[in-house]
């Protein structure tokens, strides 16, 4: 067994309690954005992910045709769009997956994906090494912001921590146009947006009685090599301050809710005022309508660079910037400038606020997750939020 496999196995099976299952998360080695093109790729990715065109209203959960699952539209994540991922076994073979509350499908690279193995250096699935593998044979193609992936559907045992899901459907990718720092994606949104039409893994856990409670939660960490954890089947009150504030899901597709407002109270800037928002662990930034994002950026003195399309601030100014405030379910939640500002190049930083023309909702990404404990309740269709320790 190669060293990488050993490390993943130790991580996957050494982090468990009787009440819930803790999955150790890894964090991308750096928060510095290496090139402006990654932001543009991010914008395209999010547009595809939520089915948005520049001139059209959004269709939550992406786009597909009635003839799917042979064709569907869903994202593929690159290394700089999301920073947190964790271990998983498929057919007893180790992979790193991005756990995404903004999608519902599970896919990993197949052995015949030469780009995945040689160019991207991802782990690939070898069907001959799994005794529980069952080929489905149904072809699928997934279109995302900067390319597409395609392959076939299959079924196998999927293990996350000490949870082993039998007969889990997933996609085996044989062609891809881009690389990521993790091998695949495991979606945690509702089954209604599962574009491969396979039951999402967490719903399989519930059906097979593998978790005590139909809830999962995120505790992500910043400025540390320990990325935090994904907790399946429960929550851990020792990881947050006070009690959870709950907000109801307004649509059982994505984790969509009503946000009271977002802004900088100290600078008399308040946007949104009762709007739709999506809690998305698969997006690293805070994304919103162009007018609102422009106002947020201007209130902190950010300058728009027309050459690279970025809102820039001098890194030395971070300590003088205001705290961002989000009003949710009548409570106030805050994000410090150290979290919403991202290093770009020498002495120049960019803001974590990205606009997307054509949307009338907000996407709350990892900028918010890093400061808060997030609980997702499948049974009661609600999100719990508390300040993380």
Annotate each predicted stretch with a short phrase.
Residues 2-96, 104-106, 208, 384-386:
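N-terminal accessory segments
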Residues 2-6, 10-36, 43, 93, ...:
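Aspartic protease catalytic domain
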Residues 112-114, 192, 236-238, 292:
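Acidic glycine-/aspartate-rich tracts in secreted/extracellular proteins
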Residues 79-93, 256-275, 353-357:
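A short acidic-Thr-Gly-centered motif at the start of a beta-strand
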Residues 68-174, 179-181, 311, 321, ...:
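Signature of the N-terminal lobe/flap region of pepsin-like aspartyl proteases
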Residues 88-90, 95-102, 106-108, 185-186, ...:
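Short hydrophobic beta-strand that contains or immediately precedes a catalytic carboxylate
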Residues 227-275:
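Flexible, small-/acidic-enriched active-site or ligand-binding loops
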Residues 275-317:
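Extracytoplasmic, non-cytosolic globular domains
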